[in-house]
Amino acid sequence: MRKITAIEVQKRSPNRVNIYLDGEFAFGLARIVAAWLRTGQELSEEKIEQLQAEEARERAFQQAMLFLSYRARSESEIRQNLRKHEIPEPVIEQTLERLRQDGLANDNQFARAWVENRSAFRPRSRRLMAMELRQKGLADEAVSSAVESVDDNALAYEAAQKRVNRLKGLEWNEFRKKMSDFLARRGFSYSVIAPVVNRIWNEAHKDEQHYEEEDLT
């Protein structure tokens, strides 16, 4: 048995404490893990190991919460981040399970939210959004479910509307090329791009000659 001789709050991390056993520094703990410890208390080696295991789980959970504080993440992204911080694999799996139970890790919800955000702020094709989600480690089932209702024609039109003001003053041929290239970079196919470019041009030049259905080649 080893006796706790001091519990000191860390100066740089007030949410953590230093534990001294038998007059010597032993280890640091999150305050939530050390909440039940008292000076003079005796700890067995088994209890010390339990405390350190709890500390590892708490450290992993706090790191995951910090990572999630910037934006929602896929489970694969969370796992990769914890690995980068040298969290042991068993602790990573325990952390992910805790996040799932708290509703903080759900790939289906993440995929739907990602598609909604992309559609609203940076419209792109169904194919490109699916590719992005797969790059984030999502399973095909979650990806397919999230993008199944994506309308490429509507999103291409929205993307073009957001872009058209930057192309004001251009002649038709240059406008057509720049807008087509922009939409192609957003992942849209030629069959979607062609009518959208004509529509956007005609809407911006209502009193001028229309170019409906003109071949973009």
Where would I find each of the regions flagged by the language model?
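An alpha-helical, amphipathic repeat domain used for nucleic-acid recognition
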Residues: M1-T217
